[in-house]
């Protein structure tokens, strides 16, 4: 999966990361992988009547990510990445991105910019990926007023 990987979750900060990654992949003439991770629901087997299992949730997340990616590609216009692939996975977002970084040239993530005590105690996906990725990481900061 050489090229650029961008992790998205449907938030505004991940959309900014996606926009940046699309432009960077186009500049580098590199393939872009858009990765959305659906956290597993602890203690939930799924498949009960009316309730989707983890695989269904991941598939829906991939479809939503594909729509968002298509919108960003149309919005950015101009040159585009060598190729764009949208993938979904089930797991812990930081762990999945770190594992994917083994075969990447660059990982791009957004940051909520929360910082402070909550980040110290809980960590954040961007912090964990920055510290443990196997390739360079770009963290797109939140917009400032």
Where are the regions a protein language model picked out?
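General small-molecule cofactor/ligand-binding pocket signal
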Residues: 35, 85-89, 138
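A short acidic, glycine-rich active-site loop
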Residues: 52-67
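Hydrophobic structural packing positions in well-ordered secondary structure
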Residues: 4, 21, 97, 108, ...
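Short, conserved catalytic or interaction motifs in soluble domains
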Residues: 10, 119, 142
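Small/aliphatic-rich secondary-structure junction motif
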Residues: 2-51, 100
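Structural beta-alpha unit
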Residues: 13, 74-107, 144-145
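Glycine-rich, Arg-bearing micro-motifs that act as flexible, cationic patches
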Residues: 106-131, 145
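Short glycine/serine/threonine/alanine-rich loop segments
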Residues: 28-31, 82, 135
């Amino acid at each position: 999966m050489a090229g650029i990987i961008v992790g998205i979750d449907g938030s505004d900060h991940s959309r900014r990361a996606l926009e940046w990654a699309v432009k960077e992949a186009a500049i580098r003439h590199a393939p872009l992988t858009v990765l959305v991770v659906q956290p597993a629901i602890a203690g939930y087997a799924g498949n009960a009547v009316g309730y989707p299992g983890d695989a269904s949730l991941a598939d829906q997340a991939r479809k939503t990510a594909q729509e968002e990616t298509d919108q960003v590609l149309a919005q950015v216009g101009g040159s585009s990445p060598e190729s764009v692939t949208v993938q979904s996975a089930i797991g812990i977002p930081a762990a999945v991105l770190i594992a994917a970084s083994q075969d990447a040239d660059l990982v791009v993530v957004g940051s909520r910019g929360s910082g402070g005590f909550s980040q110290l105690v809980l960590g954040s996906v961007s912090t964990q990926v920055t510290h443990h990725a196997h390739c360079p990481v770009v963290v797109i900061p939140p917009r400032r007023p």
